[in-house]
From Swiss-Prot:
Tissues and organs where the protein is expressed, per its UniProt entry: Expressed in adult spleen, head kidney, gill and skin and also in the embryo.
Region (UPA), start-end ranges: 1110-1252
Protein name per UniProt: NACHT, LRR and PYD domains-containing protein 1 homolog
Organism: Danio rerio
Knocked-out gene: effects: Morpholino knockdown in embryos 6 hours post-fertilization (hpf) results in reduced caspa and caspb activation following bacterial infection with E.tarda.
Amino acid sequence: MSSDYTDRNNLASAIKTLGDMLEKDEAFQRLMYNASTKGEINRGRVNKVFLKALLSAGDKVGEFLNELIDHLNLFKVLGDFSWNPPVLKEAELNERTSQLRTQQHKYVERVSGFSHYGFGETGTPARGDITSPRGPQVASIEEDLATSKLAELLLAVGDHLEKIEKKGQFLPENVERFSLDCFITSESVKLSSEAVELAPCYTEPVIIQRSKEQTEKYCQEYVRSPHTSSHLLSNDKTQSIRIGQLFSPDSDGNTPKTVILCGDSGRGKSFVLEKIILDWVHLEHHFENFDAVFLLKYEELKCLSEEMSLTELLSRSCSLTSDQISQILQLTPEKVLFLIDGIDDFSFNAHIQISSPTDPSQKAPVISIIHCLMRDLLLVESSVIVTTRYTAAAELSSLCKRPQRFTEIEGFSERRVQEYFQKFFQDEQLFKKAYESMKTNETLLTFCSVPLLCWMVCFCLKKDADQVMTELKTTTSIYVHFVSTLLEDHHQSQSFLRSLGQLAEEGMKNRQNLFDEKSVTRTGLDPATRVFMNKIYLKRKKKHELLFKFKHLSFQEFFAALYYIMLDEEESWCKVSELFNMMESEALIHRSPPIFRGRLSNPIPSVMMFLCGLFNKKVSSSLFEKMKSTFSHNVKLKKKELKKKLMKMIPAMIRQYGFELFALHCLYELQDERFVTKVLETHKFIDLSNVSLRSTDCLVLCYCLRLCPNIRELNFMNCDLTAAKLKILQPALGLCETLRFSVEHLSEIGDLIQILSESKILRELKVREDEYGVESPRWSFNLSVTRGDVLLTLSSSEKNPSFSSVLNIRLTCAQSQISRTDWTLFLQRLRKTGTLTEDSSADDDHVSLQLSSLHSVGLKSLDLTLVSLNESWASGIISLIQNCTSLQQLKVSVTGLLLEEGLKLLKKSLTDPHCTVIIEGRRNCSEPSEEHLRQSYEKVEIHFKPKLLEELAELSICNPGSSALNIHCQSCVDVADSDQWVQVEPSVCRGEGGTEFRITTPAGRFQCSRTRMRWVCDGDVTLHYRAVDGHFLNAELERLQCERVAPVLDVNVISGKLEEAHLPHYMCLAESDPALTNAVKLLSVEDEGISLESVELTRFHAKILQPMFSPKTVLVKLGIPVKVHCDLLIFMTHTCPIILNVYFFPSDSLVEENIKTEEKSSHQIKCSRPEAPLQMKKQHSLEVPDAVVQPEAIKLRGNMKPNFFQVKQPVVNDITMILSRVDDQKSVWTGTIWKKLIDIKLNKTESDLFQSGQKHKTSQPAHSFDKAQFFDTHWCNLIKSVENVDTVADKLLQKQIIHEQFYSEIIHHKSTSEESMRKICVIVRKGSAAVKEIFISILLQENPNLLNHLPSSDS
């Protein structure tokens, strides 16, 4: 083998080593990437080019290559300095950096002596395979090499190292401590000799940026200052951001100068700051604008008692001198970033005089310097990131004057948990085994959203996966298992644990996190022990003081709680009681604004939570067993006493302080189902609105709600709920009647709708998209369930919608059908609808897909509000009608124009739809004339009805008259009530109990003109019904402490089936007490007794789904103020003097009938009824000028026979009446009976009583008899008695009682008088009472003696 071949083979091996190293070197790759983006190096071929250049150098490159590899290894160490701090000390770093810089210049000189292969004239590598070079180029080697990129590369490496060297001076002097503050190292727990480095394990947490409006709302409620957060960025939106976006500009280009990062314990706040400083050292582009970054730990600063300047303070945290720092602050203060970690107990009182330095060289107490930095009295041009727990965040935000951004750190998403597991276990098989087993435990997966807990779980899984999966259910259980494992490894004694707890407890009471060596020794701990604690060297003047701290503040809180239960019973209980008293006396809860409820910076609540967890015997037993102690017996004894205290304390937390979330966390840690149920048994409503809920909070809520027996309503508005969090809450949400919450996008509730559709408890679900979200429009979703039927409403907040937008959707369907469509997909399409334009080619397909989602729901009714009715929407509507046979009514309201293209398509296709279709909007006109232009903006309403309904309408001659719905209350005009009902007149007969009704209808929606009852049926149905005197219920009502607010109706379904029944009530829902809706019940009188159930109310009716009938009415609890719609009847009983009986009574057809029967010998005088509702059970007085009125006052009553005013008016004149409330003398109704009307009545009375000077001697009744009732009784006899049918038909046509076609059939057909009269009576029977009165009057006019020839009647 030739020497040349051997040298080249060795060279290739060396080059391969170099190539592998470069491929893996992150700093080198980042350098190459930066160069390639500037057009200097082709990144895709940089390594191949480098290797080709070295290959072409031949034998001469050997020595150079060896030196290069050696120093590139040094470069790797330097580049990774901040990732692996313990490797180099400062002196060694400076010496080796100097060596590299000397070698760098030698390389540049020597490279010019080497030939290279593969570079063209522009320095771009030639194409070709590296393994088969085309041969060396001999010509112009010196010139080519001088212009090659290899020299530039080495110079760039030098510059890179110089920057790293400079930035390394800003790192904390105690390099070892720098990487151990947030993560316990493997070395400290003696699992291996390697440290757990920050960079390889770091996993980015979820950070939420809050909008200005949301932050101001939270902070103003906390600080209560009109100037709160005035410097927040005005165009920040609530959204998730990454670390590199903390200083990104808002939509207006404004960049924040202060970033507040708040979050719960263990969420990774300190980690984020350390990652920022490492990214800055490694030249990450999002922090490249800063020339200096200083990290200040607030807990250490509080230990510095001497006064100093800011420059002196900063020099303690890095290797720069005060003079060097002073120069930086003076020359480029805008390029300085301060990272202030852990301001958890910040408070500022403007009335307390403290030193306020305004110059970096001015001396002051350290805490004053930090206050001035935060209050923008020092270095206003600089930037600040401050981390804090929740309660200090609001006050910090209110003090900062720089442009500010408010953020929260939530922890890991599920995807980030997986990423962290992979980094922790490194080995792919171990990772998969651990993560897949953990995923099956949803509770553990939820806890892993807290980064600190995630690390502890990984640590425990590595030691004993099976035990972890069965035992870890609470936060306390994770800490117990972690501590037990470490104690087992280190063989620590019981005294060690007690000493550790004593130190922690003393620190809790004194608000102390750092301990000197004397304090540690006093408790019996060996300062050399590093389990659970870290050492810190704090600069004090010219010496370093050794201090100790717990690995994490939460460990101090845990050990303090553990200490309490390790004491003897008397001392333990004394300290626990003291803990409770401290919580009350310091009024911690009072200082919490809504979003911070349950998230306190003070450690006492956390100690209390751990204490509750340790009193769970299953949790603490593993720790006690390893210690071989008798503590478990003490725990059992103390637990009984603790429960007594908790029974008093936890309800007080909720009732007095509104501190639900923390109380529920305590209950969760106990894991005692019977106890939790007992504590929460009285809770019917939980309101956590504006509390930012974490995944762990949702887990706690789900557990407690499932054990809350009487929970009825939840309010989770503005709680940052996501689909993942709703999934955790799902098992409990179905247990409530009323749910209110908000989400970022409605599509996140798609799965929840599917689940809740099966709930037998849910009555109302209200969801809206977060008001602080990024996107517009925002949608709201309302769902109500009544007796198996669902009313679903979707409303948009859009004020300037696009052409194809749908603004509102309102539908009804059976609850059992609601799960038959994919609501997630439907809601996603709904949001997309607003993004389409008039010319969008996707418009047709999208609208079709949107409406087709509703085909399978079993729609009963659908209301759409559209921007414009174009051909796409018309086509979609037609398809929906054709495919949804259950649809009974479809209404389309158009806010813009009804385009002719859409209308033509509808008219062509809907000649005989199976349901009623109503289109309303403004008519579009293509004519350019001025007149038509005006008409195009006129509102129109177009109806498409089934022919069957049109035929029914022709047969139903229903003039509402006095018996139909005639309520014009303006107070409740906005209360929902559908008016799309076909009004029908039933046949009437007299039974033993009074008037009864019978009717047969086809499928549709109908209203009885007599009783106002409504019903919905899918097919033919025959009903027999009547109004019942409700006095028989008075005893039961007294027992129930209720009053009736509706007639009592007894309905019998002879054939067919009713889908819905709507029973009339006379309450005014707008004017009554807001609690009325929940206090109303439907009463049913059954064979077994009475039953009560909830009922849905509309404006005038109580809605029952798929009713099973027996006598029913509507009740309301006594004591709730109720206003009702009232009717008025006035009867004149005497003419000289005039005596009037004036009745005010709830709108009840039976009551009206009974009054008229009682007053049948009197003369009714018409007067307008009260349009405003009147208060039930409230005294009212009637004032009539120049008249005597008795009694002085009456109450409006529903359960008893109506009372009335009697008015005596001696002089015939206009009679003005004023009804007023007695308590405040407020007038509620005014009416006038004109003198002329009274004269007419008086003359008519005389004419009725006397004809030709003598009284009627016939048996013919007076004209004041009830003609409608007379017809109902005698219509069979009238068929045989009336002969002049043609004349009667003439007058019926004239009065518009019959139509032209029917009139022709009577006149021209060769029928007998009896046959013609039978046809007329059939029509009249279906008419209203007014129709019957007109008919009898016509018969009497044509045949005055007719009544004498009929059998006598009781009527």
